[in-house]
């Protein structure tokens, strides 16, 4: 959970912190001895959650080289290390740091560690801001480095990442609460929940299918393994002719008044295009999710709504007001809009929680009594206990800071709530609480919610509309299940074109086996919700099952029906 001591533990491994008592041995060296500081830091590479905390250069190449330069790597070797590290994370040496997305910056931080060639790599929530494909690339890279003999220590709240681990440690309130293999820990879901953790979606699927008799074991730790097991136990249910259903458009979407409209919006910095002819609308009272890879322009798009960024050309309307017009009342616009940035701790500034939350209401011309009332109600609404009211910000966990920032926005009673990656870095309990808060604000208070998220399973939980952005363009817009399904078809089409292969129906198969190659399929579906990933695999293998389901119960029922259990 947030605040359990994981990041503190990570800093001890790198000798950024020392314990008050006890012994810490790193590679056989006593971390308490002053002469071991440099040798330990050469051995242990550290990647933090927020890349801005460890980036110092203005150009990618310069930043990646910094660490290796400081341990006196010869120039010729340094150049090769930087080239290799950048190739591993897929970045160009000449890119400027300030032009990168949060995910792009995190790749720079990882490359900087790789260039130092450490024996141990500690990633402290380092994948939390990455899009699904970038996260998959980083985790695959870590597995490759592990095969080369490098020890990987991954601190994470993303339960799906635990599926890759050989050994898992659970921390709670500064203590080691559980440890063991994934099989051992995932067989104790109730105990995990005591510590604020939930089973990964993949494991939930395996357990639910085992309970319904679709598979005879619940120890399955990937959607690939689940699909293969279902095929092995129910081969008769799979058709020889394997086809995919055509995508459809959800025609039942409710028609509401358009609240936010983008008309042919473009944004360029010099020759670099950020947004390209963006046309979309967000309905009044709706819950809209914006998804897409890092660097697609999602955060930029969000910041245009309250006129924090102006487009190069095109028009943006909010409640009929053209915010791109020089005569627009921007102050009135911003009173309607609550905005939570990607790193919410950066918008907290007061001496304690209460003072931060009450600051906004105090500055909009209402009475002190009303301002205090709004602040206390907002703090209570986001589920923060009374004993945090007077706490300074540095005493709060990341999840608590996220809720303080949200409380400050809620206290302003906005019509629109815009959040950039509100779930990133939250533990399962914090994520669940955040989703409950957003759900209540949307359904009960009627607030229009717009979120940027990389969490597909969370998106399908509540969003009524999804916008998919890539390379500054909106490629898909519609109901979540339709958008994710069309993304799968689009991705397969793109991969087929790139690999100069032929499509058989809507599939790309390995010529020798007639099956999609595992790497191709895994890359194509990694942006999709976990349930849809499994259904697509089964459909490709020949099971006559719809690929449109995104919820656990309906997915399991569809598979049960298809295999005839």
Predicted feature descriptions by range:
Residues 23-39, 315-332:
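ABC ATPase NBD Q-loop/coupling interface
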Residues 96-104, 392-396:
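Conserved ABC ATPase signature
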Residues 161-163, 459-461:
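A short, surface-exposed alpha-helical micro-motif characterized by mixed small hydrophobic
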Residues 76-93, 369-387:
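Conserved ABC ATPase "signature" region
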Residues 117, 413:
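Conserved catalytic motifs of ABC-family nucleotide-binding domains
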Residues 121-124, 417-420:
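Catalytic Walker B motif of ABC-type/P-loop ATPase nucleotide-binding domains
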